[in-house]
UniProtKB/Swiss-Prot annotation:
Keywords: Abscisic acid signaling pathway, Stress response. Induction: Up-regulated upon salt, osmotic, glucose or exogenous abscisic acid treatment. It comes from the Eukaryota. It comes from Arabidopsis thaliana (Mouse-ear cress). Disulfide bonds: none annotated. The keyword Transmembrane does not apply. GO terms for biological process: abscisic acid-activated signaling pathway; cellular response to osmotic stress; regulation of abscisic acid-activated signaling pathway. This is Glycine-rich domain-containing protein 1. Transmembrane segments: none annotated. Pfam families: C2_GRDP, GRDP-like, GRDP_C. PANTHER family: ENOLASE (DUF1399), GLYCINE-RICH DOMAIN-CONTAINING PROTEIN 1.
Length: 819
């Protein structure tokens, strides 16, 4: 108890640290700015970046120093051009260098007080007028069509006041950061409030180290790093706050990017984790704040202007209520079992904890095992996604000694539960909890001793909408591949009808393609997609016009694109939005290194292009092999279902139903992509990083999983010299990787460059239901708890590991065991 009070005192002391910036409001603006820059990726590299750096040195900084304290600007604020603000942003994120450059050239630190961001929608007329007077030959907004690199180089070399800091490299280091903090939960008030509090705790550790003359490289998680960056964007406040706290300006070292085991980032994160937990008695790793893996490869390097093609989205749509599909919310959970007390003699060192949910859902419906930190001396963490309902149930299991036959069941010493709803509804009260839970003894357990208690640490992300997953089930009893759900209800159409069912096996709608050969009133070569709802209503959902499919009374259309390479889209869905369909898994669905057994050619990714997302945003994924679609947004549900049904039906018939392209054509176009992917997988199998898997649906149950596996469990990889493994299985299940020594963890960190996602050495991944073996490895291990159901995260067991990346794109999670 005294130790717990000491932890509380330390935390309260940390919260007394004074920050002269409203970090919550500033972080929201920071995220908005990063989002805007990401929509203008010409700022990341190339001639436009070189021109932006010149304009920053030659125009913006002189304007700022000339007018920032001038009375002529007192009536309004300066608004920098976007390109100049981005370079200024990256310069300030090296606070020591920025301060020294400002002092050298201007005699003082140039602050952002009196400056408004270009993305806030503020009037720029005053600043534009000042700019034109100072720089009549240089337009206020960067002219992308008039960039002369030779001229820029010549003018830059002639500047008297120009930083020698390598701003090109600084931009390249900062560019990936937005991906790490771009998930929707990051922008919520409660997540940012806790991030601010954790940032103060982070600074408190640094202060302690300086007072004790300890040289430690502290590495932040991404929630802390976001707030740290935000603080640095206010140069004078950051300088004053840091000098007051530690006597100097705290350096932000973002130059280290080597995430290998034993390197600076790896050891720094391990030591930061240990110091945090020793000082505050709470967990450092946090749901939704861990490394997501590398930024996905873009589907295009040129922004797509789609506004000309977009139809009016406000037009009345009588198809909106044709199908009923309840929205489901999802949270990411990070779980760790810290300790056990009052454990009876004879059980020490033999116990573990099985955890599950009282209300299993489509995202998490299995029982998983975790070791206890105090018993084994190694950190093991589970991250997974689930619906924010019911309770987490924990059972303390005592394993049998090795001399007792394996057939004997492990002894259940008791159970306890923790309500998810208590913390998330009706108002989110907190996103982290760590407490002792007293166990209720199981039947037959001794009751004459003190009650056993477990110390459980759980963190959550705020609930967000879960993607909708729908499956195409053929009504033919002999169907193979896509019929992994029982037929629900009676077939209202012909025997070749396709039932669309959700994850609960509830029928949503029944579809059938009807053509002129069926008789009736259809013209020659005309085809229709007919739909029958659960209420019995029959509607024409799509009509083939001879060159494209017209969907939902011409509100949408599905067209084939003449793709010259496998990297280009094959189809497009046009309507109130513009969606292009690419072969393979792209962007958020990009396959990771434990997903090799499912061919990337089995999938098609739906990518929306808009003014807000000129480089594309994933909105859905179609599994062509098993016939399913995941839709991230409601507007895509009906046009997405109809389009996926047409593509799945047409491509299997060799293109005879309206498209020339076939599955064979797609595979031929993608041979080079497949060859490159195979080469990368061979290389990555022997590297030190494992990243995450993406998939959408499961094959036939029990495929490759071993005993008790429901078919939803995904890959099982047991590696001898492997490290951790992330996962991203669209809310289903991820990889299981058990590794021994020579493993490294994955912190998060400064500028988005630190942290590790670790790869299994000598291991190969796989799709759902696959079992992968590495060197000196076999089978599944015992991490499944007797049944690998959907919704499990990855299991990674490693020695001397640090940090943990919580699932790619927020979809699933990891189980990481680290020293």
């Amino acid at each position: 108890m005294d130790k717990e009070k000491d932890h509380e005192v330390e935390w309260l002391e940390a919260q007394k640290i004074e920050i002269s910036v409203d970090l919550l409001a500033a972080a929201k603006q920071h995220l908005l700015f990063l989002e805007t820059v990401d929509r203008n990726r010409w700022l990341y590299d190339g001639p436009a970046l070189e021109k932006a750096i010149y304009r920053y040195n030659a125009c913006w900084l002189p304007l700022l120093v000339k007018y920032s304290e001038s009375s002529s600007v007192s009536e309004g604020s300066l608004v920098p051009p976007l390109d100049c603000e981005w370079i200024w942003h990256c310069h300030r994120l090296n606070p020591v260098r920025y301060n020294s450059d400002c002092e050298q050239f201007y005699g003082r630190v140039l602050d952002n007080s009196g400056v408004l961001s270009s993305v806030d929608g503020n009037c720029k007329l005053k600043t534009e007028d000042l700019w034109k007077r100072l720089y009549p030959d240089e337009p206020y907004e960067l002219d992308l069509d008039n960039i002369d690199l030779e001229d820029i180089s010549e003018k830059s070399s002639a500047l008297e006041k120009c930083t020698k800091y390598d701003l090109v490299s600084a931009v390249k280091r900062q560019s990936p950061f937005y991906y790490q903090v771009s998930r929707s939960h990051v922008n919520s008030d409660i997540f940012l409030q806790e991030a601010v509090a954790r940032y103060k705790g982070f600074l408190y550790l640094i202060k302690m180290n300086r007072e004790r003359s300890l040289k430690r490289f502290c590495v932040p998680t991404y929630d802390v790093d976001l707030i740290w960056h935000t603080h640095q964007l206010h140069p004078v406040s950051y300088c004053d706050d840091m000098v007051k706290l530690i006597g100097k300006v705290l350096e932000h070292d973002d130059t280290d990017s080597d995430r290998g085991k034993g390197k600076k980032l790896d050891t720094g994160f391990s030591k930061t984790t240990a110091q945090w937990e020793e000082t505050f008695g709470t967990r450092y790793w946090k749901a939704g704040a861990m490394h997501r893996g590398k930024t996905p490869v873009p589907v295009t390097n040129s922004p797509y202007a789609s506004d000309v093609l977009v139809k009016d989205p406000t037009a009345k749509d009588d198809f909106q209520n044709l199908i009923q599909f309840p929205e489901v919310e999802v949270v990411e959970v990070l779980l760790e079992i810290i300790g056990v007390r009052n454990l009876p003699d004879g059980h020490k060192g033999k116990v573990s904890v099985m955890f599950s949910k009282t209300q299993p859902d489509s995202l998490f419906n299995a029982e998983r095992r975790l070791t206890i930190l105090s018993e084994v001396g190694e950190k093991q963490v589970a991250t997974f996604q689930c619906e924010p309902t019911g309770e987490l149930v924990f059972k303390l299991i005592s394993c049998s000694p090795s001399k007792i036959p394996v057939s004997r069941e492990p002894k259940n010493l008791g159970f306890a539960s923790l309500s998810l709803k208590e913390f998330l509804f009706p108002v989110i009260t907190q996103l982290s909890v760590e407490k002792w839970l007293e166990l209720t003894p199981s039947k037959g357990s001794q009751t004459d001793t003190k009650p056993i208690s477990l110390r459980v640490a759980v963190s959550f992300t705020p609930p967000v909408r879960s993607p909708s997953v729908l499956h195409m089930v053929q009504s033919r009893p002999s169907c193979k591949g896509s019929c992994f759900f029982p037929i629900i209800g009676k077939s209202r159409l012909a025997k070749s009808s396709t039932h669309i069912v959700d994850e609960t096996q509830t029928e949503v709608i029944t579809l059938q393609i009807r053509n002129s050969a069926d008789g009736g009133i259809l013209k020659d070569d005309q085809r229709q997609v007919m739909g029958v709802t659960d209420s019995g209503e029959t509607r024409v959902l799509a009509v083939y016009t001879g060159s494209f499919w017209s969907l939902l009374d011409s509100k949408w259309s599905l067209k084939q694109i003449n793709a010259s390479t496998a990297d280009n889209p094959l189809f497009e869905i046009l309507g109130p939005r513009v969606v292009k369909i690419f072969s393979g898994r792209k962007l958020d669905y990009e396959p990771k290194h434990c997903a090799n057994l499912r061919s990337d050619l089995d999938f098609m990714t739906l990518v929306e292009f808009s003014k807000q997302h000129p480089y594309g945003k994933t909105v859905g994924l179609v599994d062509m092999r098993f016939g399913s679609i995941e839709a991230k947004e409601n507007w895509l549900l009906l046009p997405g279902i109809v389009s996926a049904f047409i593509l799945h039906t047409v491509l299997k018939k060799g293109g005879s139903e309206g498209f020339n392209v076939t599955t064979k054509d797609i595979k031929e176009e993608s041979k080079q992509t497949k060859l490159v992917a195979a080469t990368e997988n061979n290389v990555n199998a022997n590297s030190t990083n494992v990243e995450t898997q993406t998939a959408i649906t499961a094959p036939k149950k029990g495929s490759g999983c071993g005993g008790g596996c429901s078919g939803e469990c995904g890959n099982m990889v047991k590696a001898a010299n492997a490290s951790g493994c992330g996962s991203s299985c669209s809310g289903e299940c991820g990889d299981m990787v058990k590794s021994a020594a020579n493993a490294s963890g994955c912190g998060s960190g400064c500028s988005g460059e630190c942290g590790n996602m670790v790869k299994a050495a000598n291991a190969s991944g796989g799709g759902y239901g696959a079992r992968c073996k590495a060197a000196k490895a076999s089978g599944c291990g015992g991490g499944c708890g007797g049944g690998c159901g959907g919704g499990c995260g990855d299991m990674v067991k490693s020695v001397n590991a640090s940090g943990c990346g919580g699932g790619c794109n927020g979809e699933c999670g990891n189980m990481v065991k680290a020293a």
